[in-house]
Amino acid sequence: MRLFKFITYITVFLVSVYALSMLFVDESKQFTIEKEINYPVDKVFPQFNNLQNFAQWSAFFQNKDNYSLSFYTPYEGQGSSMSFQNPKNKSDFGDLFIRYSNLNSTLKYQLFEGDKKSPYQIDVKFFPQNNKTKVV
């Protein structure tokens, strides 16, 4: 019986230490995607800066055919936002915000999906290259 108590206490202690250590683990993940577009930056940047344009061609929203999209003023640039929701599944929704916009240079998005407390931070940079644009 003593051995059983000892093993139980050790197990509870180890599980507690593991749970406590997981509080300090960074859950963020970062990755970089680079794409070269065959148009100048003054043609490419407005497609990312205006959320109505962005929602029409973005792969993220193209596979959400039956979703209800709502856009809020201003419709482009810093402060613009949109929300999306699946009318058939009320728990499938989210919001997209443009938090920073530097003309023809940088955009910073925040994407909230569902009930997740922390948003996705999406930084997009535009680099002009002759008559093309490199998007990172």
Language model segments and positions:
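Glycine-rich portal/gate segments that line the openings of hydrophobic small-molecule binding cavities
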Residues: 4-10, 36-38, 42, 53-56, ...
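Beta-strand/loop substructures that line and gate deep hydrophobic ligand-binding cavities in soluble
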Residues: 3, 108-136
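A generic structural signal for beta-strand entry/edge sites
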Residues: 28, 79, 104-106, 130-134
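Hydrophobic membrane-insertion alpha-helices, especially the h-region
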Residues: 5-22
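Aromatic-capped interface at the extracytoplasmic side
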Residues: 18-34
